[in-house]
Amino acid sequence: MAGKARVHELAKELGVTSKELLATLKEQGEFVKSASSTVEAPVARRLREKFGSKSAPAPAKSAGNGATAAPATSATPATAAAAAAPAPAPAPQAPAKPAAPKPAAPQPVAPPQPAAAAPTPPPAASAPAPAPAPSAPAPSRPGPTPGPRPGPAPKPAPRTPRVGNNPFSTQQPVDRPIPRPQPRPGAPRPGTPRPGMSPNNMPPRPAGPRPGAPAGRPGGPRPGPGGRGPGGGGGRPGGPGGGGGGNYRGGGAGGGGGAGGAAAGGFRGRPGGGGRPGQRGGAAGAFGRPGGAPKRGRKSKRAKRAEYENMQAPVVGGVRLPHGNGETIRLARGASLSDFAEKINANPASLVQALFNLGEMVTATQSVNDETLELLGSEMNYVVQVVSPEDEDRELLESFDLSYGEDAGDEGDLEIRPPVVTVMGHVDHGKTRLLDTIRQANVREGEAGGITQHIGAYQVLTELDGNERLITFIDTPGHEAFTAMRARGAKATDIAILVVAADDGVMPQTVEAINHAQAADVPVVVAVNKIDKEGADPQKIRGQLTEYGLIPEEYGGDTMFVDISAKQGTNIDALLEAVLLTADASLDLRANPDMEAQGVAIEAHLDRGRGPVATVLIQRGTLRVGDSIVAGDAYGRVRRMVDEHGEDVEAAMPSRPVQVIGFTSVPGAGDNLLVVDEDRIARQIADRRSARKRNALAARSRKRISLEDLDSALKETSQLNLILKGDNAGTVEALEEALLGIQVDDEVELRVIDRGVGGVTETNVNLASASDAIIIGFNVRAEGKATELANREGVEIRYYSVIYQAIDEIESALKGMLKPVYEEKELGRAEIRAIFRSSKVGNIAGCLVQSGIMRRNAKARLLRDNVVVAENLTVSSLRREKEDVTEVRDGYECGLTLTYSDIKEGDVIETYELVEKART
């Protein structure tokens, strides 16, 4: 049939039920679901052959020539008419050539012979062949004698062809050899042409016919030159034999070749043994060797199963994604889905769809936080490893053949350097006063509110055992908002001095300083300060610090405790001696001064006249004027270096703190400083760090909107936008972290849209006007016409000099932005005793006030049998003895109307008012 047949159509045609046919198809490995499923043409042909052979009648032998009657189900009308001829005339025969084989009439054959045995063709046929059909006479041509046409043979049961000779087979002979089929009684002997070899009764083929191939003639094809008739006649002497079955392609069982010719040939168009000269024969299956025509047709079940197992695993929503085997994927902070897709060779759109199905709405180029990347990776069986900032920076420097944190050269190049000491402790415990006493200076008076809000770095010359020694001191803030500054100070130090007030004891920032020092693995010297004050108890301090692992030497520990008074200058020399002894005993303080300088930016600020200024502590190497430097995302060339006394420095050795002028922008506090060969390399490193920092900040600040809380996300929320300006980078960073840590309520949100170092400029005012933001100036003022522009645009600028004042006021502003919360306050209750109906105002309730007061325009609810009938009502009118009143007290009768008419006697009216409640 021209198109694909359906199962129920084939079942009706073959005379079986659809259920039986479905079972047969499933046994053969076909993918069918119901009686409406379609069946390919080769499968339908196989089914017709199978069920047709079962229902074919038994063959009946003819009395004259031994030919059998054709089966009624498959014989064509022309073949049936030829078989019914009573006295067929013998066909005219040309003289046979000596070398041509002479096929004999079909006769019963002996039991099957081995496959390797080559059967000998019998002499010329003595039985006459049936006459051809009148509609297509076969003219006699001079040439080889065509083989006789025996009568139609009984239709054989479908046999499995040999693998090597069947180009449509889906199996290979080396995998699963197929046994040779047994010969049938009345069939031609192997090696002889099969009777009735026409395209209508050829053996079944697993694959479909070639589209557009002409159908075979009824009665068999006309024999042509070279014996190209049914079964393949003899060829020319010395030439290749003819192939059988001109309408079939591929290497099948061909006819016998001529004497001295090639072996049995194949079908037309394929090298099958007896093809054109120069072509290789394809009889590999006959000799048990692999080869032959390429495999075609349907895939085997094993191939389909392997293909199914190798398919990409689907995830939620049916999106097909790569399925990993637990591989580790390294991604930078703030990576996008496009970066992830590039690592696993996937489509970014598929990752976007997969995240949407998981409840996250992210675009392909948007920075994604670490948790989302890890969640998506686990769905695809990947382990996502977000590269830490340290590893990321190390890989960046390695790409430029640079390294940080190691001394160049060998042991002979190292020289002794001064120790770096960080003074840490709780606020107001005397850290800056101790440094003032050591430096013989007054630093504390310059700090607003008497608390340190910067990191100061100083180098002090002291004397130990008659030898002058240098000590570098770093002063850190003690306020709770400066946690990041204390952590940076601990990382850049060799020894930590923990200052504890003898009259105050261990405080929260004291414990935090201990944790920073222990995390940085630096030794600690405890200075018990304010021993001159009343109530001072140094022994109590020693006992408290024992709980945190700082055990005094007099208690058998290894921590040195020194009782001092920074105000009186008591035991300051003993403290410095303890610092130097600890450095000599516990630390190897050496560095190579001859390499390119490396250090850390302690703090940075923007100076009006000098530009960006960074306080840098040199850790190794020597920094000179003119060096190309990079610190974080800032780069430049050293134009000038100044020490803590304001004097110019040409070269800064290890452990020397200096102020560096020449950066193009303000570096971040705690950024590593590195000297490179040229400005181009410094700019490239700074640009790549800036891009990474921007992506990481975008991923952190992106508010995750999931499908579950989409409704709440779409609700109107109050947002307070801030622009932060400060005198140095560390203070701005500390202020931002402190403000973002304020937790008020989900209804209000704090957002820092811009931050910077320096005074308030007109650009800041314009940005604040466009975004409805408030400008916070910390230790800075507005520049030029910025104040006039702010007044004209209505932009609020607030100035602060103490950090906790800014935190308190911003928190109060956030609380003021909260939506008000109302609390219900009951006013009174009244029982309806009578109902009066009026055509003007409706039902009037005559009530007796049982408790409280009834007030006009008050909120009310109607209760019936203690069940609320109506809510959110209003007392629209209130009368007492025909007079309008504003309220009626307990024990009096009144008449009132409600904004609800379905009232009954015995109902209770309860009035209340909503009082705004302060939110905290």
Curated annotation (Swiss-Prot):
Region (G1): 425-432
Positions of the UniProt region annotated as Disordered: 33-305
Cellular compartments annotated: Cytoplasm
Boundaries of every tr-type G domain copy: 416-588
Location of region: G2: 450-454
Bias type Basic residues, positions: 295-304
Residues holding GTP: 425-432, 475-479, 529-532
SUPFAM superfamilies: Initiation factor IF2/eIF5b, domain 3, P-loop containing nucleoside triphosphate hydrolases, Translation proteins
Residues covered by region (G5): 565-567
Entry-linked Pfam families: EF-G_D2 (PF22042), GTP_EFTU (PF00009), IF-2 (PF11987), IF2_N (PF04760)
Compositionally biased tracts (Pro residues): 87-159, 179-193, 201-212
Keyword entries, A-Z: Cytoplasm, GTP-binding, Initiation factor, Nucleotide-binding, Protein biosynthesis
Region spans: G4: 529-532
Gene3D superfamilies: 1.10.10.2480, P-loop containing nucleotide triphosphate hydrolases, Translation factors, Translation initiation factor IF- 2, domain 3
MF terms in GO: GTP binding; GTPase activity; translation initiation factor activity
Listed Gly residues bias regions: 225-291
Biased composition range(s): Low complexity: 53-86
One Gene Ontology cellular component: cytosol
Protein family: Belongs to the TRAFAC class translation factor GTPase superfamily. Classic translation factor GTPase family. IF-2 subfamily.
HAMAP family linked: IF_2_B (MF_00100_B)
Record-given protein name: Translation initiation factor IF-2
Lineage, opening ranks: Bacteria, Bacillati, Actinomycetota, Actinomycetes, Mycobacteriales
